[in-house]
């Protein structure tokens, strides 16, 4: 074969490789562009800020160590204000203008559901969203990857156990009137079937509500002694706080959405007794093991405040991405990344998160979950993992 023919073949191969790289948006020779949508100025801004900080910490660590196969991460974060309409606009900007490779740790159920069609149209992965809705892995889509057992399963699994332990006469529900709250409601209804019970009363509130007097009054009037909460931060605090003022003290049972130190920090002693499902444990620094204290000190040095469990969610999302992208190798395309995820196992971490396992048919990492309760102003784990 002539030298000129060798040269032509080499040139053609280089063009082909360049074309493949060019077709994978968000990936260049020295950079990977990731996008995230958080609530930075709405009702869940406390969560969104923490998730963002956790992501930034892990991104900085990775970049300081040379990146992923020689590529640094550039993280772009947009504010949804916890509004699905804003989430669509943010997704359009990140996907179509900023050309992100993947959407990572997007906060909110309705917000993810609104944004995913924009992403999937451009072959952009939805990676480790910060919501436990089933829609994060159902119906199956090759670009969906979730790591939190769904709200539906959390309530369906633990509510019968709560009933058997507390022996309530009337189980009721207060829930946010959107996809998140409906998942909690469905889980409660299904879980009660296992103990031959039904909800005696149920009532909803609009996203962003601040007054829960009428909802609590309905619970009290129906003599509800176990109340399932499809609530997040201020709705949880508002509901329980209102109940305490009325001298109404049922057992309150929430989901992982209410598992945050903000509940007892902002709600005070009235929040004692609240149960919530969870996986990753909140890092209380005065009782944490040395690896967590070391990590928390790095966090505090960078942001001048203590981390919380949502900081961990953000940190872990980037860490899992880095594991998968690193194993994918230098030829980082969406298809190659998905193939890596199809066989990825992530071991349990220093925060007590369960092992995650993915496969070509399995787009959720784990169904494992456990239960915590606020006791003496802090969350205490009160059950072992189930569904492992």
PLM regions and their residue ranges:
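Sec-dependent signal peptide hydrophobic core
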Residues: 5-15
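Extracytosolic ligand-binding ectodomains
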Residues: 2, 9, 22-388
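N-terminal signal peptide c-region/cleavage motif recognized by signal peptidases
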Residues: 17-19
